Amino acid sequence: EQCNVDDFLMITYTRAAAAELRGKIAAELSARVARQPEDDHLRRQLLRVYRADIKTVDAFCGSLLRENTHLLRPVDGRSLTPDFRVLDEQEGQVLRSRVLERVVEDFYQKIQDGDQRARLLADTLGAGRDDRRLTELVLELYDKLQSHPYPLRWLAEQRRQWEHLPEHLADTPYGRIMMDRTLSAAAFWEEKLRSAAGEMEQYPKVQKAYQGPFLAVAEALSAYPAAAARGFDAMGEVNPAFPRLGAVRNAEDEAFKERMKALKDRCAKAVKAQQAVYAVGEEAYLEDLREMGPAILALMELTASFTAAYQQEKVRRNCADFSDQEHYAIEILTTPDGTPTGLARQVAGRYREIMVDEYQDTNEVQNCIFSAISRQEQNLFTVGDVYSYSVFQAPRNHHYRHHKDYGYGKT
């Protein structure tokens, strides 16, 4: 097709990678022009490649913001201007510390005014004698918030859940995470064990001693989904412990036998770790959550206060950090319900294709941006390594949806 190179948005994750990619495209175009000097279209691409959008997420968001700061919602009566400055890491840390110091002073004033949640949080962390743990937790939670497309909305949702704890642990985020990890691990090891049992058919001696135990544990692991439907305590009743493996003398392939033993040991260790989670019953976990609830709510309120104060101070100084640029981009590209704005549709119209490298390293914030500026993800092409995630990580299924008719490339 007679495409122009600047009809594409190409996202990489370092400036060096962006420069390298631009250089490779320019070199390839030069080589083709040398072979086809009469091709005017190719010659035009040599000029266009230097204005093509080949950049990092930060650079893309920064350019978008400088063109559209007028669309940002004011913060305490102020807004960023197009000449806003991006804070470097050290500046950001210094400014965060100053703002947090003021916010913590207000927190102690709340305690003096009789705020019981604030007092419980302070007592739990030993605050007053040493504020370091309190400030560390606020900054840790703040940093985690930045991985969400709508941080304060997400925090408000968590606060509502802590204010009204469900009757069952499976209905809490904490319980769901534990159970989902177990289900993911069980599915992973069940597949591994069944596959290994199939391989054993080539080695009758190993098969006779090992296949039965492997299949027995695989079958036990398959019981986890049904147990999860019954609740948290039912998960603890599943017992996928390995029976003792039989002895194998003069195995057909000693290396294969040792590989099977090593697989068994890894599986047994992983299963044991999961079973330990359920050694404490559901009611004990729920009681802990009820006791921690007021302190957790106070921590969330303190973090929300810090987030707002820090944002106000940055806007007052007409500056932003890297995560701000991404969140501001979401603000002007999506409505509160996540629908693309007019600006998003306008940006989407610029590009035939949006290509994202190292997609496994994207977070929900960046994924939201890519989704907003694509045509319902039909022109979004992503390349990433599906195997970069641990089996125990939370599911990231949105990374593995197929866009258009492409399969995912391999890194």
Feature roles, as predicted:
Residues L9, R51, R352-E353, N379-L380:
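The start of beta-strands in P-loop NTPase/AAA+ ATPase cores
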Residues E1-R73, E313, R317-S323, Y328-E331, ...:
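P-loop NTPase Walker
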Residues D7, R132-A320:
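Conserved ATP-driven helicase/translocase motor core recognized via long
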Residues L46-D53, L72-Y150, E258-C267, V271-Y278, ...:
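ATP-hydrolysis module of ASCE/P-loop NTPase motor domains
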Residues A27, A31, A262-A276, E282, ...:
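Conserved RecA-like helicase ATPase core segment
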Residues P336-E353, I373-Q376:
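Short basic/glycine-enriched coil/helix segment immediately N-terminal to the Walker B
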Residues A52-S63, A122-S147, L299-S305, A320-L333:
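Core structural elements
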